Amino acid sequence: MKHTSDTPSNSDMPSDSQATQPNASATGQAAHAYSSQAQRASADAQAVAGDEAAVAEAVADVDVAELRRQLEAAEEKARQNYENWARATAEGENIRRRGQDDVAKAHKFAIEGFAEYLLPVMDSLQAALADTSGDATKLREGVELTLKQLYAAFEKGRVTELNPVGEKFDPHRHQAISMVPADQEANTVVAVLQRGYTLADRVLRPALVTVAAPK
């Protein structure tokens, strides 16, 4: 009986060159990958170096002295603007305070001018009271003179008398206390019981009147 050996023959075993071929292929691929990474890293390094060079060139082109001059000019402008604002604010406050003072003085002394116009009237009245002569004619003349002085004071103070006899009734300037039969047209002022007065077109006191009744 012929026996066959389980040991492979030399012809069945791979040669040394065949065994090393897969290892050589893997090594080549790894080397190629490393080379590609190295190339990319080198390109990135060159790009970064280029950017740094551009930045350095831009910084070198900046005139530091000019920038400092511009900064100082801007600071000076800001200081001037602040001073102008502070000055304007102070002036506005002074104007407001002066305005308040003027209004307060106007309220306090509004009657001062008119009071001065009335002083001659007071003098005449006091002189009339001091007269003990008992002369009625002289007393009347004194009263008439005093009345003229009072009218003059009213005129200076822009006070106007309302004596609307024969005028149409005006509810803004007249106060009717009754309606009476009369020959005048209806709503015509027939009589003035108490004269009214205005101050610069503002009614101080309406005239008390009677008015013609409708026929």
UniProtKB/Swiss-Prot annotation:
CDD domains (UniProt xref): GrpE
A Pfam family of this chain: GrpE
Any one GO cellular component localisation term in the record: cytosol
GO molecular function: adenyl-nucleotide exchange factor activity; protein homodimerization activity; protein-folding chaperone binding; unfolded protein binding
Region of interest called Disordered, as start-end residue ranges on this chain: 1-52
Amino acid composition bias (Low complexity), ranges on this chain: 29-52
Keywords, in A-Z order: Chaperone, Cytoplasm, Stress response
Subcellular location(s) of the protein: Cytoplasm
Key word Cytoplasm present: yes
Gene Ontology biological-process annotations: protein folding
Biased composition (Polar residues): 1-28
InterPro entries: GrpE, GrpE_coiled_coil, GrpE_head
Coiled-coil intervals, chain numbering: none
Record's subunit section: Homodimer.
HAMAP family with a match to the protein in the record: GrpE
Cited function: Participates actively in the response to hyperosmotic and heat shock by preventing the aggregation of stress-denatured proteins, in association with DnaK and GrpE. It is the nucleotide exchange factor for DnaK and may function as a thermosensor. Unfolded proteins bind initially to DnaJ; upon interaction with the DnaJ-bound protein, DnaK hydrolyzes its bound ATP, resulting in the formation of a stable complex. GrpE releases ADP from DnaK; ATP binding to DnaK triggers the release of the substrate protein, thus completing the reaction cycle.
Entry's family note: Belongs to the GrpE family.
UniProt cross-references to PANTHER family, sorted A to Z: GRPE PROTEIN, GRPE PROTEIN HOMOLOG, MITOCHONDRIAL
Annotated protein name in UniProt: Protein GrpE
Source organism (scientific name): Ralstonia pickettii (strain 12J)
